Protein backbone atom coordinates (compact mmCIF):
# COMPACT_ATOMS: atom_id res chain seq x y z
CA UNK A 1 0.00 0.00 0.00
CA UNK A 2 1.32 3.45 -0.93
CA UNK A 3 -0.18 6.53 0.72
CA UNK A 4 0.63 10.19 0.29
CA UNK A 5 -0.37 13.22 2.28
CA UNK A 6 1.20 16.41 3.57
CA UNK A 7 -0.47 16.09 6.96
CA UNK A 8 0.06 12.41 7.72
CA UNK A 9 2.16 13.16 10.78
CA UNK A 10 -0.44 15.45 12.27
CA UNK A 11 -3.24 13.00 11.51
CA UNK A 12 -1.33 10.36 13.43
CA UNK A 13 -0.83 12.67 16.40
CA UNK A 14 -4.49 13.69 16.53
CA UNK A 15 -6.12 10.38 15.68
CA UNK A 16 -7.22 7.87 18.28
CA UNK A 17 -5.71 4.80 16.70
CA UNK A 18 -2.57 2.73 17.02
CA UNK A 19 0.31 3.19 14.61
CA UNK A 20 2.00 0.09 13.12
CA UNK A 21 5.55 0.81 14.29
CA UNK A 22 8.16 -0.85 12.11
CA UNK A 23 5.70 -1.61 9.32
CA UNK A 24 5.59 1.78 7.62
CA UNK A 25 8.41 3.36 5.64
CA UNK A 26 8.19 7.14 5.46
CA UNK A 27 9.71 9.36 2.80
CA UNK A 28 9.56 13.13 3.07
CA UNK A 29 9.07 14.83 -0.28
CA UNK A 30 10.28 18.34 -1.03
CA UNK A 31 9.87 20.77 -3.94
CA UNK A 32 12.31 20.26 -6.79
CA UNK A 33 15.82 21.55 -6.19
CA UNK A 34 17.47 23.67 -8.87
CA UNK A 35 19.30 20.58 -10.15
CA UNK A 36 16.01 18.67 -10.39
CA UNK A 37 14.47 21.67 -12.14
CA UNK A 38 17.28 21.53 -14.71
CA UNK A 39 16.61 17.82 -15.19
CA UNK A 40 12.92 18.49 -15.75
CA UNK A 41 13.78 21.06 -18.43
CA UNK A 42 16.16 18.68 -20.22
CA UNK A 43 19.35 20.49 -19.25
CA UNK A 44 21.44 17.47 -18.25
CA UNK A 45 24.49 18.80 -20.11
CA UNK A 46 24.38 22.04 -18.13
CA UNK A 47 24.28 20.06 -14.87
CA UNK A 48 27.42 18.18 -15.88
CA UNK A 49 29.18 21.41 -16.87
CA UNK A 50 28.32 23.05 -13.56
CA UNK A 51 29.47 20.00 -11.62
CA UNK A 52 32.70 19.81 -13.61
CA UNK A 53 33.38 23.51 -13.06
CA UNK A 54 32.74 23.16 -9.32
CA UNK A 55 34.94 20.10 -8.90
CA UNK A 56 37.85 21.52 -10.91
CA UNK A 57 37.60 25.10 -9.59
CA UNK A 58 37.45 26.46 -13.12
CA UNK A 59 35.11 29.16 -14.48
CA UNK A 60 32.02 28.04 -16.33
CA UNK A 61 32.14 28.91 -20.03
CA UNK A 62 30.12 32.04 -20.82
CA UNK A 63 27.56 30.19 -22.91
CA UNK A 64 26.78 27.82 -20.01
CA UNK A 65 27.08 30.55 -17.39
CA UNK A 66 24.49 32.72 -19.13
CA UNK A 67 22.19 29.75 -19.68
CA UNK A 68 22.47 28.79 -16.00
CA UNK A 69 21.60 32.34 -14.90
CA UNK A 70 18.57 32.48 -17.19
CA UNK A 71 17.30 29.13 -15.92
CA UNK A 72 17.97 30.10 -12.31
CA UNK A 73 15.83 33.22 -12.75
CA UNK A 74 13.06 31.02 -14.13
CA UNK A 75 13.47 28.73 -11.12
CA UNK A 76 13.08 31.71 -8.76
CA UNK A 77 9.73 32.49 -10.38
CA UNK A 78 8.45 28.96 -11.00
CA UNK A 79 9.87 27.19 -7.97
CA UNK A 80 9.88 23.46 -7.48
CA UNK A 81 6.31 22.36 -6.85
CA UNK A 82 5.74 19.55 -9.39
CA UNK A 83 2.32 20.87 -10.47
CA UNK A 84 3.77 24.32 -11.12
CA UNK A 85 6.75 22.98 -13.06
CA UNK A 86 4.45 20.73 -15.08
CA UNK A 87 2.23 23.70 -15.91
CA UNK A 88 5.20 25.73 -17.09
CA UNK A 89 6.53 22.90 -19.25
CA UNK A 90 3.12 22.46 -20.85
CA UNK A 91 2.25 26.14 -21.36
CA UNK A 92 5.38 28.29 -20.90
CA UNK A 93 2.87 30.81 -19.61
CA UNK A 94 3.62 32.60 -16.35
CA UNK A 95 0.00 33.59 -15.79
CA UNK A 96 -0.82 29.88 -15.73
CA UNK A 97 2.10 29.32 -13.37
CA UNK A 98 0.77 32.00 -11.03
CA UNK A 99 -2.70 30.47 -11.11
CA UNK A 100 -1.35 27.13 -9.88
CA UNK A 101 0.73 28.85 -7.20
CA UNK A 102 -2.39 30.70 -6.05
CA UNK A 103 -4.23 27.37 -5.79
CA UNK A 104 -1.40 25.91 -3.71
CA UNK A 105 -1.38 28.93 -1.40
CA UNK A 106 -5.16 28.70 -0.97
CA UNK A 107 -4.87 24.96 -0.33
CA UNK A 108 -2.36 25.55 2.46
CA UNK A 109 -4.73 28.02 4.09
CA UNK A 110 -7.63 25.59 3.67
CA UNK A 111 -5.58 22.91 5.42
CA UNK A 112 -4.90 25.28 8.30
CA UNK A 113 -8.62 25.87 8.79
CA UNK A 114 -9.36 22.14 8.60
CA UNK A 115 -6.71 20.70 10.90
CA UNK A 116 -5.80 23.47 13.33
CA UNK A 117 -7.87 24.98 16.13
CA UNK A 118 -9.55 28.35 15.37
CA UNK A 119 -6.92 30.34 17.28
CA UNK A 120 -4.08 28.36 15.72
CA UNK A 121 -5.62 28.92 12.30
CA UNK A 122 -5.76 32.72 12.63
CA UNK A 123 -2.18 32.89 13.84
CA UNK A 124 -0.86 30.38 11.32
CA UNK A 125 -2.41 32.33 8.44
CA UNK A 126 -0.97 35.57 9.83
CA UNK A 127 2.53 34.07 9.93
CA UNK A 128 2.10 32.53 6.48
CA UNK A 129 1.00 35.79 4.88
CA UNK A 130 3.61 38.05 6.51
CA UNK A 131 6.73 36.07 5.59
CA UNK A 132 7.54 38.33 2.60
CA UNK A 133 7.56 41.30 5.00
CA UNK A 134 9.80 39.40 7.41
CA UNK A 135 12.32 38.67 4.67
CA UNK A 136 12.18 42.18 3.21
CA UNK A 137 13.45 43.78 6.43
CA UNK A 138 17.04 44.98 6.72
CA UNK A 139 17.36 42.42 9.51
CA UNK A 140 15.69 39.30 8.16
CA UNK A 141 15.51 37.63 11.56
CA UNK A 142 11.95 36.44 12.27
CA UNK A 143 10.21 38.95 14.54
CA UNK A 144 6.77 38.39 16.01
CA UNK A 145 6.14 42.16 16.08
CA UNK A 146 5.98 42.14 12.27
CA UNK A 147 2.84 39.99 12.50
CA UNK A 148 1.17 42.30 14.98
CA UNK A 149 2.59 45.25 16.89
CA UNK A 150 1.98 43.71 20.31
CA UNK A 151 2.54 40.08 19.30
CA UNK A 152 4.47 37.87 21.70
CA UNK A 153 6.41 34.70 21.05
CA UNK A 154 4.28 32.65 23.43
CA UNK A 155 1.15 33.56 21.44
CA UNK A 156 2.52 32.42 18.07
CA UNK A 157 5.04 29.69 18.88
CA UNK A 158 2.51 26.86 18.59
CA UNK A 159 1.24 28.10 15.23
CA UNK A 160 4.79 28.45 13.93
CA UNK A 161 5.60 24.92 15.08
CA UNK A 162 2.49 23.71 13.26
CA UNK A 163 3.60 25.34 9.99
CA UNK A 164 7.02 23.76 10.31
CA UNK A 165 5.56 20.35 11.14
CA UNK A 166 3.48 20.22 7.96
CA UNK A 167 6.34 21.45 5.79
CA UNK A 168 4.80 24.76 4.75
CA UNK A 169 7.78 26.73 6.04
CA UNK A 170 11.44 26.06 6.75
CA UNK A 171 13.41 27.34 9.74
CA UNK A 172 17.01 28.54 9.59
CA UNK A 173 18.51 28.89 13.07
CA UNK A 174 21.51 31.14 13.70
CA UNK A 175 24.67 29.47 14.99
CA UNK A 176 27.29 31.30 17.03
CA UNK A 177 30.17 29.31 15.52
CA UNK A 178 30.60 27.34 12.31
CA UNK A 179 31.76 24.19 14.04
CA UNK A 180 30.37 20.66 14.16
CA UNK A 181 27.94 19.65 15.45
CA UNK A 182 26.08 22.82 14.53
CA UNK A 183 23.23 22.05 16.93
CA UNK A 184 25.58 22.72 19.85
CA UNK A 185 26.03 26.31 18.67
CA UNK A 186 22.42 27.09 17.80
CA UNK A 187 21.04 30.38 19.08
CA UNK A 188 17.45 29.23 19.37
CA UNK A 189 15.93 32.67 19.81
CA UNK A 190 17.46 33.95 16.57
CA UNK A 191 16.11 32.37 13.39
CA UNK A 192 14.67 33.05 9.95
CA UNK A 193 11.56 31.51 8.43
CA UNK A 194 11.20 30.82 4.71
CA UNK A 195 8.47 29.37 2.54
CA UNK A 196 9.33 25.80 1.59
CA UNK A 197 9.38 26.84 -2.07
CA UNK A 198 11.14 29.81 -3.66
CA UNK A 199 8.45 30.18 -6.32
CA UNK A 200 5.83 30.54 -3.60
CA UNK A 201 7.89 33.38 -2.10
CA UNK A 202 7.97 35.12 -5.48
CA UNK A 203 4.19 34.74 -5.76
CA UNK A 204 3.34 35.76 -2.19
CA UNK A 205 5.63 38.79 -2.33
CA UNK A 206 3.78 40.08 -5.38
CA UNK A 207 6.94 40.16 -7.47
CA UNK A 208 6.17 40.26 -11.19
CA UNK A 209 7.85 37.42 -13.12
CA UNK A 210 9.33 39.85 -15.66
CA UNK A 211 11.04 41.80 -12.87
CA UNK A 212 13.03 38.67 -12.12
CA UNK A 213 13.42 37.31 -15.63
CA UNK A 214 14.42 40.50 -17.44
CA UNK A 215 16.23 42.68 -14.93
CA UNK A 216 19.84 41.59 -14.59
CA UNK A 217 20.27 43.39 -11.25
CA UNK A 218 17.09 42.27 -9.49
CA UNK A 219 19.13 41.31 -6.40
CA UNK A 220 20.26 44.93 -6.06
CA UNK A 221 16.67 46.18 -5.81
CA UNK A 222 14.68 43.35 -4.30
CA UNK A 223 14.71 41.94 -0.81
CA UNK A 224 13.65 38.59 0.51
Label each residue range with its predicted role.
Residues 1-3:
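Conserved Walker B catalytic segment
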Amino acid sequence: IVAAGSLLGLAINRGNFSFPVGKVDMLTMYPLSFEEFLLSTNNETLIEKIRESFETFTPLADVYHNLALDLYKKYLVIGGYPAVVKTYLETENYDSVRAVQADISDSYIADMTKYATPNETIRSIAIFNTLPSQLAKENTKFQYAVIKSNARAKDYELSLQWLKAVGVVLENIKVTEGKLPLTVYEQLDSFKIYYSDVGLLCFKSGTFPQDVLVNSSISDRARG
